[in-house]
Structures are given as C-alpha cells and as structure tokens.
C-alpha cells in the first residue's frame, strides 16, 4: 500500500500530457484560521462527496467533491486525513472510469 503523497504524485504524473497541467492540478495550501486546503481538479467521473465533521475548534474537516473537482478543508492537524480522502476520491474514479487506470 502506498502513502497518500505518493498516490497523489502518481495521479498527477499520469494526467500530465503537455496540456492538462497548464489548466489543472493539485493545490495544497495553508489557511489563516489556521488549517489546510487541498484541491484537485481536472478529473472526470469522480465520486461525489459532501462531508463536514467538527470534532473541536482545531480538529475539523469539510469536503465537497464533484465528478470533476475535489475541495477539502481542515484544521491544522487534519492534512493527512484530507490527503487520504483525496486519494479515496482518485481511487474511486480510477476503478469506476470504464476500465481506465490512473496508476
């Protein structure tokens, strides 16, 4: 089993074709509240996700994903959880994309 960063790296690399990467990609940034934002776009047939969990003021996640875009937000300690959810979105898409594999 590969870690989340490796899975995201492989997904990104599999998409890069000289054109795609100029308009799409992966974004991981810090928020000023504090927290994290993880965004992936440029996919097709992704799993729709609408998830919001607030455990406490600094331990929370909010994920909205469509078939084409994943947007996840979380507290300062929730980056690994957000990355794992992004990989789940990619893996679902890879196994439900009419036999096409992104790995």
Q: What are the functions of these language-model segments?
A:
Residues 8, 12, 49, 82-86:
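Generic structural signal of hydrophobic/aromatic residues within well-ordered alpha-helices
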Residues 1-45:
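Negatively charged, low-complexity tracts enriched in Asp/Glu with abundant Ser/Thr
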Residues 54-101:
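Helix-rich interaction surfaces within compact, conserved domain-sized segments
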Residues 37-62:
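A short, structured beta-strand/loop element
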């Amino acid at each position: 089993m590969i870690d989340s960063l490796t899975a995201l790296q492989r997904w990104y690399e599999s998409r890069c074709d000289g054109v795609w990467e100029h308009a799409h990609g992966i974004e991981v940034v810090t928020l000023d509240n504090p927290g994290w934002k993880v965004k992936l776009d440029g996919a097709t047939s992704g799993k729709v996700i609408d998830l919001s969990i607030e455990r406490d003021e600094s331990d929370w996640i909010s994920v909205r994903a469509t078939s084409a875009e994943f947007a996840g937000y979380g507290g300062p300690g929730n980056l690994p959880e957000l990355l794992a959810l992004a990989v789940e979105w990619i893996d679902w898409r890879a196994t439900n994309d009419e036999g096409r594999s992104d790995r």
